């Protein structure tokens, strides 16, 4: 089984309007609300391909309950660790061929919740053959958390695929135990190497 980690999931809300007008009311008949986050996108694709997959991460509040409900509706197996703070929304407004996004920062995780999640993860680790880690960490979490997860998984022979960026990625790559694979885009790779992003004409 493949375990997917989404530590900072969201409800992706899409609003479609013909024209986005500033400083006034905009009305829409087209609204979509779906569980979001890179790891959940990975989970959906794996399920479509027929691979056994288990989604985990952090969920809290009414928004977290909505995400779990929607995953259960499509029989996407999940076992998230509960937190006190509310899971975030990410809003996309589609207008005039453009997309304007409003991204909430997300919850702040306590040290006790981080420790609880790691214990939860170690329980799930006994059931899986491969782990994917996708996306950012929420506020309050140790930036070395992914490195810790990679170390714990590798110690029991479970490879980890890592898709993140910034300092979290740098710490994971500088740790003694490395991920089996990383997936940086051009901008992330340039930042990791400390060089200007390449451009094409």
What is the meaning of each model-derived region?
Residues 5-9, 58-61, 83, 136, ...:
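Cofactor-binding loop segments of dinucleotide-utilizing enzymes, especially the Rossmann-like FAD-
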Residues 110-149, 153:
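Hydrophobic alpha-helical segments and helix pairs
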Residues 21-22, 72-74, 96-98, 176-182, ...:
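Short, hinge-like loop/turn segments at secondary-structure boundaries
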Residues 24, 48-128:
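Conserved N-terminal subdomain of the carbohydrate kinase-like
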Residues 147-201:
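Conserved phosphate/ATP/ADP-binding segment of small-molecule kinases
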Residues 5-7, 80, 132-133, 160-164, ...:
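General beta-strand structural signal in soluble alpha/beta enzymes
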Residues 1-56, 64-66:
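Glycine-rich phosphate/adenosyl-contacting loop at the front of the ribokinase-like
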